[in-house]
């Protein structure tokens, strides 16, 4: 997909870069697979902010995505590729031979008219879903389960890809894009290929307003706050953070400090993403 730049009629247009997607469906989504979603503005049921930098943005309908791919052995035809405002990847509308329609994450190279299938004996082709025990070592995969039958949890964003590097006993070893090596049960399912819309990372919004349209509010530096608001706050004129090590608003070290405390699943990480 080509990239598009604009005439510099304003500072926002001068900096913007967009991905041209002429093959995307121009109409409304499939009505039976759409539901409304309310916005919290980052607040909990007490009205207090629990997630910062969230609020505003354009209204969106949620597209119900089939992350489980549990219609086994039934072929489906790709009707169209659609835009999904809830994720960076595009989605594909499948029509099964029994008439049912479902959305899936669109892998790279998938187009309208292609056929896909899920099952243990499915061919190794982009868009097909198989258990890890039936996928050849070295294959590039995405939409991977962490627990059998729970649905895809890993590698769902635009351009995401994971490589199956080994299989030993009841576990398969995966190399994630971050560099992390992780063990996953071989009964977990994964989809062949990498996620489409891989040029999404080359896009530039161009102006702050484009970020606000997406429901993202500004991020304020701690050093620009008062001491009551942040450990880095206060000082005369443009003072620095003052601390020997940077911390979060709640005093927890940041910028490289490890915060993972889930010992139960630590055994499945063969190599940390930091090396």
Curated annotation (Swiss-Prot):
One record GO biological process: cytoplasmic translation
Region spans: Disordered: 28-49, 224-246
Keyword Transcription regulation applies: no
Pfam families: Ribosomal_L2, Ribosomal_L2_C
GO CC list: large ribosomal subunit
Sequence similarity: Belongs to the universal ribosomal protein uL2 family.
Assembly with partners or alone: Part of the 50S ribosomal subunit. Forms a bridge to the 30S subunit in the 70S ribosome.
PANTHER family cross-referenced by the UniProt entry: LARGE RIBOSOMAL SUBUNIT PROTEIN UL2M (PTHR13691:SF5), RIBOSOMAL PROTEIN L2 (PTHR13691)
Protein name: Large ribosomal subunit protein uL2
Organism of derivation: Stenotrophomonas maltophilia (strain K279a)
């Amino acid at each position: 997909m080509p990239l598009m730049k604009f005439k510099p009629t304003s500072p926002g247009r001068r900096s913007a870069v967009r991905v041209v997607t002429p093959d995307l469906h121009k109409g409304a989504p499939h009505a039976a697979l759409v539901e409304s979603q309310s916005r919290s503005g980052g607040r909990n049921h007490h009205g207090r902010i629990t997630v910062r930098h969230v609020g505003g943005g354009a209204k969106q309908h949620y597209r119900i995505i089939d992350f489980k791919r549990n219609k086994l052995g039934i072929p489906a035809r790709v009707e169209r590729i659609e835009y999904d405002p809830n994720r960076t990847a595009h989605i594909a509308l499948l029509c099964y031979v029994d008439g049912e329609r479902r959305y899936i994450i669109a892998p790279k190279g998938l187009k309208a008219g292609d056929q896909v299938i899920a099952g243990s004996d499915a061919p190794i082709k982009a868009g097909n879903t198989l258990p890890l025990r039936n996928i050849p070592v070295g294959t590039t995969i995405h939409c991977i389960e962490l627990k059998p039958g729970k649905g895809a949890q890993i590698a769902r964003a635009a351009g995401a890809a994971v490589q199956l590097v080994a299989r030993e006993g009841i576990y398969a070893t995966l190399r994630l894009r971050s560099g992390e090596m992780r063990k996953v049960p071989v009964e977990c399912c994964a989809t062949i290929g990498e996620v489409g819309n891989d040029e999404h990372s080359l896009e530039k919004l161009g102006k702050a307003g484009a970020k606000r349209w997406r429901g993202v509010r500004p991020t304020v530096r701690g050093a620009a706050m008062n001491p009551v608001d942040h450990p880095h706050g206060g000082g005369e004129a443009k003072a620095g953070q003052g601390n020997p090590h940077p911390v979060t608003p709640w005093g927890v070290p940041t910028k490289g400090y490890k915060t993972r405390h889930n010992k139960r699943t630590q055994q499945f990480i063969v190599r940390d993403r930091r090396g």
